Regions:
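P-loop NTPase motor domains
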Residues: 42-51, 56-345
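N-terminal pre-Walker A segment at the start of P-loop NTPase domains
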Residues: 20-56
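N-terminal cationic amphipathic segment used for targeting or macromolecule association
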Residues: 10-12, 36, 211, 274
Length: 345
């Protein structure tokens, strides 16, 4: 029976609200502020009756939403898809099965969206993403290294600080070296795999490259990390290099098999015009899947920098929303909570 003050259960809040309480929430937490209804593009859809403004300072509440539920409980079809079809701002969508892309592509295009797809299951038909092109300084390369190490750890990991620091120094040296030079085809994870594969040889090409870099800039971060790696005993260094090469083995194939050979997704432009970037098929590409946490980490850094230094008001033209289905399967994103706080500030 319908009562005069029908209670509406809001599972996200674990509370039961009356209609008056819902109206009060709408007045203070979503657009248009001060009204007891929700309307406009600048709201996230939480439920049929509850919306939440992106404007955290006005709404006095963070616009980050965590949805928990068992298989087939409606997380994708009842939460992610409606927000995507709301078509407000730009989106980055984790879509492992490709279902969201199929159901929304036509509608989004009709609304003027540019569609970009990183398809791990079909690299030949995919857009490209090269994480090295979004690295600027030593902190960026360190984050790449952390993403790579954390997301390629074997299940039988043995905690050995010396080994971990040796691999970290090697990857930091190689990534920083490639980033500093940005020589087209040579600034790729494929080239990084080649360099770590030859790093164990003393006096060979690897040493020559870094000694030449030392002449140009002795305190280059790449050179400093190289010097740390060269402190590793030769026998141990060979094992470290073999392990490092295995971590990058997924990027040692042909260009058509590797979506990191080029970059066509232009992360820095996502806030300039309405764009939907889909990350799909990664359930079929376990090794190249390491690119997803790299992309998410770099997305925050890139957009925050773009907004701060390339927009007079410090805000992007288009709000960028992450809709991350099956989030636990995405992998480890370094300092995610800090990135969320900075990205929504």
């Amino acid at each position: 029976m319908k009562k005069e003050n029908e209670k509406v259960c809001q599972s996200a809040e674990a509370l039961c609200w009356t209609e008056d309480e819902i109206k009060e929430f709408n007045r203070t937490h979503n657009s248009p502020f001060g009204e007891d209804y929700a309307q406009g593009e600048d709201n996230l859809l939480v439920s049929k009756n509850i919306f939440l403004s992106w404007n955290d300072s006005m709404a006095r509440r963070r616009s980050d939403i965590l949805v928990l539920g068992s298989t087939a409980s409606g997380k994708t079809s009842c939460v992610i898809l409606p927000n995507l079809m709301h078509a407000s701002g730009s989106y980055v969508v984790a879509d492992p099965s490709g279902e969201l892309l199929k159901r929304s592509r036509a509608a989004l295009r009709q609304k003027g969206y540019a569609i970009r797809v990183l398809d791990f299951a079909n690299p030949a038909a995919s857009d490209g993403y090269n994480p090295l092109l979004y690295s600027v300084d030593a902190e960026d390369t360190l984050n790449l290294t952390r993403c790579l190490l954390e997301n390629t750890e074997p299940g039988n990991k043995v905690n050995d600080p010396f080994w971990e620091k040796s691999e970290t120094a090697l990857f930091n040296a190689v990534f920083a070296f490639l980033v500093r030079r940005r020589q087209g085809e040579k600034c790729t994870l494929h080239e990084a795999h080649r360099l770590v594969s030859i790093a164990a040889e003393r006096g060979g090409e690897f040493d020559a490259l870094f000694e030449e870099a030392r002449k140009r800039k002795p305190n280059d971060p790449a050179v400093l990390s190289y010097d740390v790696f060269r402190l590793v005993p030769e026998k141990t260094a060979k094992a470290v290099c073999a392990s490092a090469a295995e971590r990058l083995a997924a990027f040692n194939g042909k260009p058509l098999e590797d979506i990191s050979y080029c970059d066509t997704i232009a992360l820095d432009e996502l806030g300039d015009a309405k764009t939907a970037l889909f990350l799909t098929g990664f359930h079929a590409a376990e090794k190249q899947k390491v690119l997803i946490p790299m992309l998410i980490a770099q997305l925050f850094n890139t957009l925050v920098y773009h907004a701060a230094f390339e927009y007079d008001e410090g805000e992007l033209k288009e709000h960028v929303t992450l809709l991350l289905d099956e989030f636990p399967n995405i992998g480890y994103v370094p300092e995610l909570s800090s990135r969320l706080a900075c990205g929504t500030a």
